[in-house]
């Protein structure tokens, strides 16, 4: 006698079938993404085949790389990446994505990569104007409240977002189609990010009056005036914030204090001056605001692990690549 399936059995069977189909889609998407990135970038390094879309290949582990984040959506096709922002630690892989919403000093490291299985990743830069436009067209509300949001976080990469990014990568091989379709696919990606778990964070970069936007303006000012004395009272007043409120909101967004932020920007610029413009340590230190050469050397060693000129010699010997999210 044939046993009739109950409603519960049918529902479970349907759920199992849907999960299986989703798993197949995810696997196919990851495999195609790896194939296309490997085809698009043959040697180690970073390339920008389409405006705002960066592809990166790394065939050996890297040491800690210091650099600056920018507002961007970042995914990994193969491998994983570790990232430090102040006291915060992040790790992401093919099942997760990283969303950054401000320009901040970061440290990035790739621990596993080989010629047989290189690290493959991509980054899509995000324009606040496009985020704002998509919010308006889709009727999405402004960020909830006026509190600040962390400038960086990692979330699970869902299949719809992954497939949208894959469609963008496909356009690399079709320049004629890219001219017409890239703006549309980019807006789809922005929309999917806006309605994701990180959507509220992303909305902050388009909200002029929000606390996160005000901190972003402070970050921009500190980066531009890194060699000048830090005047917190004046900056907070300019942003319409109390000094204590500014400190609290700044650390909530950047994971560091304004003074720590300025120090990292100064030291990274000094490193660039010594490595790129062949300045000596004393001159580079003075250029970025350090009048005391000994103090500059101590601060530099504290951040980069070695004294200034020894660090630059190591960089030149290793021909270190620029940091990428």
Task: Give a label for each model feature.
Residues 7, 12-32, 131-188, 192-193, ...:
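Amphipathic alpha-helical segments enriched in hydrophobic/aromatic residues interleaved with Lys/Arg
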Residues 24-60:
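N-terminal, Lys/Arg-enriched amphipathic/low-complexity engagement segments
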Residues 45-142:
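N-terminal regulatory/effector-sensing and dimerization cores
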Residues 188, 192-198, 205-208, 223, ...:
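Basic/polar phosphate-binding segments, predominantly the helix-turn-helix DNA-binding elements
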Residues 222-225, 274:
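Short helix-to-turn junction characteristic of helix-turn-helix DNA-binding domains
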């Amino acid at each position: 006698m044939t046993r009739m399936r109950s409603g519960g059995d049918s529902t479970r069977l349907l759920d199992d079938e849907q999960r299986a189909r989703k798993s197949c889609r995810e696997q196919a998407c990851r495999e195609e993404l790896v194939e296309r990135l490997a085809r698009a970038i043959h040697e180690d390094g970073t390339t920008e085949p389409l405006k705002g879309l960066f592809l990166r290949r790394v065939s050996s582990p890297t040491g800690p790389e210091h650099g600056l984040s920018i507002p961007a959506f970042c995914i990994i096709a193969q491998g994983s990446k570790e990232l430090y922002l102040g006291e915060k630690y992040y790790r992401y892989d093919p099942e997760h994505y990283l969303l950054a919403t401000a320009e901040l000093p970061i440290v990035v490291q790739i621990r596993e990569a080989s010629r047989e299985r290189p690290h493959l990743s991509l980054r899509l830069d995000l324009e606040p104007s496009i985020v704002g436009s998509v919010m308006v067209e889709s009727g999405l509300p402004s960020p909830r409240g006026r509190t600040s949001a962390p400038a960086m976080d990692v979330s699970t990469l869902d299949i719809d977002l992954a497939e949208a990014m894959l469609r963008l990568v496909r356009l690399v091989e079709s320049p004629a189609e890219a001219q017409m379709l890239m703006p549309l696919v980019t807006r789809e990606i922005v929309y999917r990010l806006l309605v994701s778990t990180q959507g509220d964070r992303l909305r902050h970069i388009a909200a002029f009056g929000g606390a996160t936007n005000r901190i972003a303006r402070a970050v921009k000012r500190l980066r531009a005036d890194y060699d000048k004395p830090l005047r917190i009272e004046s900056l907070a007043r300019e942003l319409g914030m109390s000094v204590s409120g500014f400190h609290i909101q700044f650390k909530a967004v950047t994971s560091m204090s304004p003074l720590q932020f300025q120090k990292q920007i100064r030291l990274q610029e000094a490193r660039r001056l010594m490595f790129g413009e062949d300045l000596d340590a004393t001159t580079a230190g003075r250029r970025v605001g350090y009048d005391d050469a000994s103090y500059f050397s101590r601060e530099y060693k504290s951040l980069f692990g070695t004294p200034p000129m020894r660090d630059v010699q190591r960089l030149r010997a290793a021909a270190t690549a620029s940091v990428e999210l």
